[in-house]
Amino acid sequence: MLIFWTITLFLLGAAKGKEVCYEDLGCFSDTEPWGGTAIRPLKILPWSPEKIGTRFLLYTNENPNNFQILLLSDPSTIEASNFQMDRKTRFIIHGFIDKGDESWVTDMCKKLFEVEEVNCICVDWKKGSQATYTQAANNVRVVGAQVAQMLDILLTEYSYPPSKVHLIGHSLGAHVAGEAGSKTPGLSRITGLDPVEASFESTPEEVRLDPSDADFVDVIHTDAAPLIPFLGFGTNQQMGHLDFFPNGGESMPGCKKNALSQIVDLDGIWAGTRDFVACNHLRSYKYYLESILNPDGFAAYPCTSYKSFESDKCFPCPDQGCPQMGHYADKFAGRTSEEQQKFFLNTGEASNFARWRYGVSITLSGRTATGQIKVALFGNKGNTHQYSIFRGILKPGSTHSYEFDAKLDVGTIEKVKFLWNNNVINPTLPKVGATKITVQKGEEKTVYNFCSEDTVREDTLLTLTPC
């Protein structure tokens, strides 16, 4: 009996969680759902604020290149800075093995200054993020509480409301934003840039980013393939009001993974190979960066899956329109009451990521031949290159439809150029044409019609004009 009670007391003691409290931030425990679960088996407490060393670095239109430090311990640093009470404020929060005093974080501030007057605060918690992954994932809680504390200071000391605040977080930083939002009623917006999967996916909402953390939550997924075996860092779980899955959300054009990297331990994976191994994961903030200067180049289409999107089943935009992935996603807020909607789009491979989707339908004329047909669009803003619409048997009277993503918005479409070829010598020299070509831009209801009665031989351009 003595042995029984000894074992029982030992087990009760082992099951009892630990807790640590930090002044002004509250208490943090390692019990469920923060630890001791299937998703978070290790019980780890977050580091102290002093050890994490979070800094709030303010950039404004008046000081775009040199930051001013805002101190939680001294609110007067806000009043002494260039912080403007009549402007919106955007916090940018980096993720695992990253830093907030240079690189993409400060680049984002500078891009913002090109389109708006804004207070841009970079949250630098590099000491807390440059730990083992499991420790950094738990440090998220303290950093989130510190961001919430800064928002509370702005409200209580300067009557600056959270309704003017937007939190932008990448990787672990997305969950930092969620943590801060859960403690800040009335927060306007959170943008999650590829929120990480490990230690957060399928956890209760209090642990991760979720739609209740702000009035509007938009999420961009770029590395959502399973962590095992594909080494996808991001989550596939929908965590916002609007969840965007560019290029399907798993493999981004221009990114290739090294199979050998899959055997590297997660805690050391970023050292020396961050940009190479995490290309998909990093694309989320690169897309956001480019979206700032491209208000209409990232239209995303509601669809059940990327397969359906690629099968031309989700074109054009519905009556309520399509949201823009990235900086201007909030222009769609309020146009739908639903949460966790999926949106899909395609992007370019490297820089110039913006794309404009067009749907084309071609009715053929002339002789029956084997080959492929292509079209190029010409508008008042420019023209596209030739896009392949169909390959196979070209029969007169047959109609072929296809959607493609152009590198530019051609504006009002004025004419279409048709081309066909098969790269095989045909002694009969058949002629093929298009009696009608219809074109629609995905974001518009206008359908452009172009006609021609002519036919042309292989590799000869045929111009169709409005009809």
Curated annotation (Swiss-Prot):
Per UniProt, subcellular location reads as: Secreted
Q: Give residue ranges for domain PLAT.
A: 356-467
Any idea which GO molecular function terms this record carries? calcium ion binding; lipoprotein lipase activity; phospholipase A1 activity; triacylglycerol lipase activity
CDD domains (UniProt xref)? Pancreat_lipase_like, PLAT_PL
Keyword Transferase on entry: no
Where would one find the signal peptide in this protein? 1-17
Keyword annotations for this protein?
Calcium, Disulfide bond, Metal-binding, Secreted, Signal
Which one GO biological process term can you cite for this protein? high-density lipoprotein particle remodeling
Q: In which tissues is it expressed?
A: Pancreas.
Instruction: List residues binding Ca(2+).
Output: E205, R208, D210, D213
Q: Name one GO cellular component term.
A: extracellular region
Disulfide bonding pattern of the chain? C21-C27, C109-C120, C255-C279, C303-C314, C317-C322, C451-C467
Q: Which Pfam families match?
A: Lipase (PF00151), PLAT (PF01477)
**Active-site residues?**
S171, D194, H281
Which Gene3D superfamilies did the record assign?
alpha/beta hydrolase (3.40.50.1820), PLAT/LH2 domain (2.60.60.20)
Q: What does this protein do?
A: May function as inhibitor of dietary triglyceride digestion. Lacks detectable lipase activity towards triglycerides, diglycerides, phosphatidylcholine, galactolipids or cholesterol esters (in vitro).
Q: Which family does it belong to?
A: Belongs to the AB hydrolase superfamily. Lipase family.
- Name of the protein in its database record: Inactive pancreatic lipase-related protein 1
